[in-house]
Design a protein with these regions (language model features):
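Short, mixed-charge, low-aromatic patches
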Residues: 2-10, 64-69, 88-90, 129-136, ...
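Short, mixed-charge aromatic SLiMs
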Residues: 41-45, 72-73, 154-158, 266-283
Length: 344
């Protein structure tokens, strides 16, 4: 079976990094481009982390394109309290060996599917700012992709950043609303935090298994989630940290992992109290569905894919713990990377 041609939009923090390993090193994905956006961390940091993650996967051939540095109408609210100041657990990762591409993410998101209509699958792991910006220029954008998978929302209205909202939608609800209003269920599938919370939790025994593998990718995946594990223990009440972006990526790579789904009409709340909440209309009189919502996945199958991928031994230029990022700009014109434990 040929690898799935992919374009990935990411605000690369710790779980995005693991999702990039699945796509770039697992053999099921053919990653044509990674676009970055501000979300978990500021844009320059997300771009740096995407470059490092791809290096860890041995894929310095995959281009990385920076995109929007802030939400459409709001100021940036990052998740550095979850992922660390550097977005990768503050473990002192080395600077990337290459620079990102000069072309803007939105131009790439528009241009690639025009050149290859119906061929590419888009996977979004971030606030939907880049995608919404692209839609304002091409309202038919989703018809040009084979399919679009978004790690977005919480279909049970149980949130992680707010009582009823998931971070990616909460961070830029106006962008998420633009996406839902352009979507159709045959083209756009959302995998929400409710799925991750139920079927993608790395319990202590899973974390120990990851650590015992000892490969560069397994060690990377384990260590970059260090601060997420602390946050999960203190805030979510889960048995371990969960992996929302990797499970969304796994669904895109292996849709047969889906065990429960529904089609529904979804809108997004943009008011202060309910900011980012999914409004799902399941009434008989509801408007026509605009999204497919994944509700459950095969947990054993997902974790099998994860462990099989990171168990691979591949050449990589990333040496964990061998040297720390210098704090200098990681590529010409980029801001300096934050030192581990520093505060902006």
């Amino acid at each position: 079976m040929p690898a799935l041609p992919l374009v990935i939009d990411s605000d690369t923090g710790s779980d995005d990094a693991v999702a990039l390993l699945l796509a770039a090193a697992g053999g099921l994905g053919d990653v044509r481009a990674v676009t970055t956006v501000a979300g978990n961390v500021p844009l320059a940091t997300a771009t740096r982390n995407a470059l490092i993650s791809l290096e860890t996967a041995g894929r310095t051939d995959i281009p990385v394109h920076p995109g929007c540095a802030r939400p459409m109408v709001r100021s940036l609210s990052s998740a550095q309290h979850v992922h660390g100041e550097d977005g990768m657990g503050d473990i002192g990762l080395p600077d990337p060996v290459r620079a990102p591409e000069p072309s803007h993410a939105v131009d790439v998101l528009l241009g690639l599917p025009r050149d290859r209509p119906g061929e590419l699958t888009l996977v979004t792991l971030a606030p939907l700012t880049n995608i919404a910006a692209a839609l304002t220029r091409d309202p038919l954008l989703f018809t040009r992709y084979r399919h679009v998978y978004c790690m977005a929302g919480a279909a049970d209205m149980r949130g992680n950043v707010a009582p009823t909202a998931e971070f990616n939608v909460w961070a830029d609800p106006e962008a998420a609303r633009i996406v839902t209003r352009a979507a159709t269920p045959d083209k756009v599938t959302w995998v929400g935090w409710d799925v991750s919370r139920k079927d993608a939790v790395m319990a202590p025994e899973d974390q120990r298994r990851l650590e015992r593998l000892g490969t560069p990718m397994a060690t990377f995946a384990h260590r970059v989630n260090r601060t997420v594990a602390d946050w999960a223990r203190d805030v979510t009440g889960l048995a371990g940290y969960d992996l929302p972006d990797p499970v969304a990526m796994a669904v895109a790579l292996k849709p047969e992992l889906i065990t429960e789904r529904e089609q529904a009409h979804v809108d997004i709340a943009v008011g202060d109290q309910t900011r980012g909440q999914m409004i799902i209309d399941r009434r008989v009189t509801a408007p026509a569905p605009n999204l497919t919502l994944v509700r459950r996945v095969d947990e054993v199958g997902f974790k099998g894919l994860l462990f099989d991928t990171v168990a691979r031994r591949i050449p990589t230029s990333v040496s964990l713990g061998a040297r720390r990022g210098s704090g200098a700009a990681p590529w010409p014109g980029a801001p300096a990377a934050p030192a581990p434990g520093s505060r902006r």
